[in-house]
Amino acid sequence: MTTETLIITGGHVLQLGQDPGIIEANIRVNCITGKITNIDEDPVSAQQRDANDEIIRTLDAAGCVVMPGLVNAHTHAAMTLLRGYADDKPLQAWLREDIWPAEAEMTPTGVRAGTELAIVEMIRSGTTAFADMYFHVPEVVAAIKNAGVRARVGHGVVTAGKDDEAARNDLNKGLEVAQAYDGAADDRIQTAFMPHSLTTVGEEYLQEAVSEARQDNIPIHYHANETRSEVDPIVDNHNKRPLTYASGLDMLSSSDFLAHGVHLETDEIDQLAEAGASLVHCPASNMKLASGIAPIPALLDAGVTVALGTDGAASNNDLDMFDELRDAAMLGKIGADDAAAVPAAQAIHMATAGGADALGLPGGQIKEEAVADLIVVDLDSPHLTPTHNIISHLAYAARGSDVKHTVCDGTVLMQNREIQTIDVDAVVETAETQAQSLIQRMS
């Protein structure tokens, strides 16, 4: 059988782990299995067929660094349609007065358009995998399948403000989606049960749904301890801190990943560590909504797996994970009053291997037999000159626009900054039309 091989040639290769560094190597990928087969220095020629009927395709990485694809571990992809719609407001007012009313008018077509726009932005800026909490999930799944990226998806369940029938319908939808789409797109798509938060889903509903999710080994993802106004009602109503409340509902296990964790007390950090649950840090969104500064150094010291996420484009307002990892490093230093806190390599780890680990997805590392979720970052720019320290540059100076090639599961999604799997012009045009239509319905 003919084998198709991709070889990424001539690049600096980022190696993470205990001793982060850079090596000079070519990376060989089996495009059928989607895995890295070899990392070496052997020269290869472009577009050739060898004696074993092997088709070889090359990507030029000269003057570039090859690194694991970035993982956006918490977002709401279709919220790209609400980018810039409602800014400069605190979280609860923003949600209740602007975002939730707008989302009530979202159509399946709009969610598809917004998700495709988000995926274009993510591929261009080096994200190969993401976690998406939203609705009209069949449209989200279709967009992911066509684009070639990797994701863990779920229906964002909200029961607050609904009668029992509507609440149970939403709850059932969350469970049905998690069961229906797990393993879709040749396993590139995984699922989770995704209650919005501990305050927007009632306790009795959580008890019922979490029990079913656990029976099916479905991970759980939710917003936790994002703002004081989210923490206080739980303390007032249950006389417990949020993560103690969550633990009592069996919502704190090694497969679960929580978004934000801004207002965590020491015992809650210990609970996360003991449970093996992961925390997704969303620094840009937390800054924009004035939610606070998550205690990332303390979480890392406790051994908690920390990933990074952009949150939705309505609260960020972009999906560039290079921005996010820089924000994480700098905000971590401010929060700890320590310039050595959250160093460059640690921030990159959170945006790659940390994200893959939190989501329970492959990726996040470059080694033989690992999945080929890779990006090539072009260092030939004034803002990346001189290259005293490539790892430092990736954390503090690189931008999403520096990404030259993007590969996911051994498939080239972007080559020389041209996306291969999506008609970008059509996506942008459709998203603009859907966004304007949404706003017209709102008015």
From Swiss-Prot:
InterPro entries in UniProt: Amidohydro-rel, Deaminase_MtaD/DadD, Metal-dep_hydrolase_composite, Metal_Hydrolase, MTA/SAH_deaminase
Please list the cofactors this protein needs. Answer: Zn(2+)
SUPFAM superfamilies xrefs: Composite domain of metallo-dependent hydrolases, Metallo-dependent hydrolases
How is its cofactor bound, per UniProt?
Binds 1 zinc ion per subunit.
Is the keyword Transmembrane assigned to this protein?
Answer: no
> What does it catalyze?
S-adenosyl-L-homocysteine + H2O + H(+) = S-inosyl-L-homocysteine + NH4(+); S-methyl-5'-thioadenosine + H2O + H(+) = S-methyl-5'-thioinosine + NH4(+)
Q: Report the EC number(s), separated by commas if there are several.
A: 3.5.4.28, 3.5.4.31
Binding locations of substrate? E103, H196, E226, D311
Q: Which UniProt keywords apply?
A: Hydrolase, Metal-binding, Zinc
Q: Which GO terms describe its molecular function?
A: 5'-methylthioadenosine deaminase activity; metal ion binding; S-adenosylhomocysteine deaminase activity
The residue range of the signal peptide is none
Residues binding Zn(2+) are H74, H76, H223, D311
Task: Give the family from UniProt.
Answer: Belongs to the metallo-dependent hydrolases superfamily. MTA/SAH deaminase family.
The record's function comment reads:
Catalyzes the deamination of 5-methylthioadenosine and S-adenosyl-L-homocysteine into 5-methylthioinosine and S-inosyl-L-homocysteine, respectively. Is also able to deaminate adenosine.
State the name under which the record lists this protein.
5-methylthioadenosine/S-adenosylhomocysteine deaminase
Q: Which organism is it from?
A: Haloquadratum walsbyi (strain DSM 16790 / HBSQ001)
